């Protein structure tokens, strides 16, 4: 079905995401930080990216989403941002959607049904 790039430094999250989405027939590729993820997105041309906010630096995911939106080869790739930041006091300082280049947010821990629903929502329709 689809090739999905998961950019996250938490191997448990990546493995859980892989298990859920491979059951749906998707191929999962992984990057452990924003720079690696950006390079993989340019090389692999995934159908969708699931991106963590905080990895190497506090806002690594935000800078990665910005770089992807500014690069012609990745600008149209839908991004779902997965974060545990929504349940912290840091959330009030988080940029609003108008400053982000993402299609949706998922709060960690992510429920499998929510993950599947959001992925289906943003994948290109099958021909």
Give the label of every model feature segment.
Residues 44-51, 55:
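Active-site beta3 strand of CheY-like receiver
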Residues 25-32, 40:
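Short hydrophobic/Thr-rich beta-strand motif most characteristic of the beta2 strand and flanking loop
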Residues 15-23:
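Charged docking surfaces used in two-component/phosphorelay signaling
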Residues 45-47, 73-79:
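His-Asp phosphorelay/catalytic-motif detector in bacterial-type signaling
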Residues 7-8, 31, 49:
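Conserved sequence signature across two-component system core domains
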Residues 39, 62-75:
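Short amphipathic alpha-helix used as the core "switch/output" element in two-component signaling
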Residues 59-63, 85-107, 113, 117:
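Alpha4 helix (beta4-alpha4-beta5 surface) of REC/receiver domains from two-component response regulators
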């Amino acid at each position: 079905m689809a090739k999905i790039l998961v950019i996250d430094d938490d191997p448990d999250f990546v493995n859980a995401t892989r298990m859920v989405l491979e059951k749906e027939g998707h191929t999962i590729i992984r990057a452990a930080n924003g720079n690696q993820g950006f390079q993989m997105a340019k090389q692999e041309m995934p159908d969708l990216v699931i991106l963590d906010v905080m990895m190497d630096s506090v806002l690594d995911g935000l800078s990665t989403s910005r770089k992807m939106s500014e690069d012609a080869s990745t600008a149209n790739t839908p991004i779902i941002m997965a974060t545990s930041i929504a349940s912290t006091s840091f959330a009030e300082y988080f940029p609003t959607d108008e400053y982000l280049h993402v299609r949706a947010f998922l709060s960690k821990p992510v429920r499998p049904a929510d993950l599947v629903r959001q992925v289906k929502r943003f994948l290109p329709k099958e021909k």
